[in-house]
């Protein structure tokens, strides 16, 4: 099994370019099967394991998927041969549930095995099912698969009981070809929700209000292929911003939308780091001590849960006490035991992590327990004295393209073995 070996203690310096957003791409690719005419050419697609998995699922439906280069895919879904998405690829990733909305919209039926992803807590799809049923679908779950069908889909008002990115996107996809208008209330506002809406509109959909908590989708007769570029990855950018601060380095992160990073920038500034925004870049550097801060994860525009774990690593060597409250996922502190192996002083109480900063971490053999915990471990290795070995890095590969190569470009001593 592959692992990462890091010889820590070097400040990161230089510039790095951010890829397209994982969280947008993994919804856009399933949504591409809505196009009954023409082909979708999608660029700025991150070269990650989750995308490769989706490519295989789309091919299994009978679609033609051509890789034009490492970051560009051409998808022709004119002739889909099955409405069943089953098998190991479907089961092992959460984003496969977007095939439910896409197949339901286009064919009025689907069978999709229940997905997995990162082991960070219960990920129910009750809000998805509630929305599909409101549109007129009948849903059953049997033998680990969602079976769904409808004579027709009729637009309606859907109020989400909780803010859910997955449910917002899935219902947005499903409603594109419904009769009449669908209104999604208490919708998620994340940048990748907006990006999926923009992609749907590029195919001919009529989606308005994405980025607010009320989204209106007026159904159309058909969707067609289009050319589209995936939005830059807010989470990858945030991870490199945090790594720059943690190593007390000086890094310019390019191909970003600074507005999407404001909650992260605000916390870094509060700690004492310097953040300079350009039109499509952010520079992070440190020229003094960093102090502890308190933070609470929240739906966008709040502090993103997906960079909470890397932030925990940064705070582990900041002066004073910090408290992180995780409000999105109930089991997203698995990285803490790994950080403690490296000398961090952290106590978990329920959804809170109480961190007392130490002067330094020391290298150890640690495990990437999930995707973002893996990023936290990489940053921990970069700031530690000695050698760190990270195992289970298949989790990291799900969301960070060629992570060791990017950090090497910034001067890190990191190799994959």
Curated annotation (Swiss-Prot):
Positions contributing to phosphoenolpyruvate binding: 22-23
Pathway listed: Cell wall biogenesis; peptidoglycan biosynthesis
Pfam family, one: EPSP_synthase
Residues annotated as catalytic: 118 (proton donor)
Subcellular location: Cytoplasm
Residues annotated to bind UDP-N-acetyl-alpha-D-glucosamine: 94, 123-127, 306, 328
Coiled-coil blocks: none
Any one GO cellular component localisation term in the record: cytoplasm
One BP annotation, GO: cell division
InterPro entries, per database record: Enolpyruvate_Tfrase_dom, Enolpyruvate_Tfrase_sf, MurA_subfamily, RNA3'P_cycl/enolpyr_Trfase_a/b, UDP_GlcNAc_COvinyl_MurA
GO molecular function term, any single one: UDP-N-acetylglucosamine 1-carboxyvinyltransferase activity
EC number in record: 2.5.1.7
Enzyme class, spelled out: transferase
UniProt modified residues of type 2-(S-cysteinyl)pyruvic acid O-phosphothioketal: 118
Function: Cell wall formation. Adds enolpyruvyl to UDP-N-acetylglucosamine.
Protein name, per record: UDP-N-acetylglucosamine 1-carboxyvinyltransferase 2
């Amino acid at each position: 099994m592959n692992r990462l070996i890091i010889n820590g203690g070097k400040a990161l310096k230089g510039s790095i370019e951010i890829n397209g957003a994982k969280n947008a791409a993994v919804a856009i690719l399933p949504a591409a099967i809505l196009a009954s005419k023409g082909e979708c050419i999608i660029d700025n697609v991150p070269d990650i394991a989750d995308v490769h998995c989706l490519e295989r699922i789309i091919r299994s439906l009978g679609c033609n998927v051509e890789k034009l280069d490492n970051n560009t895919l051409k998808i022709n879904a004119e002739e889909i041969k099955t409405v069943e998405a089953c098998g190991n690829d479907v089961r092992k990733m959460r984003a496969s549930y977007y095939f439910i909305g896409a197949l339901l919209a286009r064919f009025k039926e689907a069978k999709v095995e229940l997905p997995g992803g990162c082991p960070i807590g219960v990920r129910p799809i009750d809000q998805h099912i509630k929305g599909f049923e409101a549109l007129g679908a009948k849903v059953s779950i049997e033998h680990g698969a969602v079976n769904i069908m409808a004579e027709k889909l009729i637009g309606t008002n859907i109020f989400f009981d909780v803010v859910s990115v997955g449910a917002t996107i899935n219902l947005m996809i499903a409603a594109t070809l419904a009769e009449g208008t669908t209104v999604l209330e208490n919708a998620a506002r994340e940048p990748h929700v907006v990006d999926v809406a923009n992609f749907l509109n590029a195919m001919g959909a009529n989606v308005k209000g994405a980025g607010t908590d009320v989204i209106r989708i007026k159904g159309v007769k058909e969707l067609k292929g289009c050319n589209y570029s995936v939005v830059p990855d807010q989470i990858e950018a945030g991870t490199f911003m945090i790594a720059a601060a943690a190593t007390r380095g000086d890094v310019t992160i390019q191909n970003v939308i600074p507005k999407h990073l404001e909650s992260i920038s605000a916390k870094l500034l509060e700690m004492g780091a310097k953040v300079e925004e350009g039109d499509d870049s952010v520079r992070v550097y440190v020229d003094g001590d960093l102090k502890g801060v308190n933070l609470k994860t929240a739906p966008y525009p709040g502090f993103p849960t997906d960079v909470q774990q890397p932030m925990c690593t940064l705070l582990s060597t900041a002066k004073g006490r910090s408290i992180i409250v995780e409000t999105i996922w109930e089991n997203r502190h698995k990285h803490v035991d790994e950080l403690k192996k490296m000398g961090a002083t952290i106590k978990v109480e329920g959804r809170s992590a109480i961190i007392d900063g130490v002067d330094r971490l020391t290298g150890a053999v640690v495990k990437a327990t999930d995707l973002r915990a893996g990023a936290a471990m990489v940053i921990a290795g970069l700031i530690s004295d000695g050698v760190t070995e990270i195992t289970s890095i298949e989790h990291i590969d799900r969301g960070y393209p060629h992570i060791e190569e990017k950090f090497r470009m910034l001067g890190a001593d990191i190799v994959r073995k």
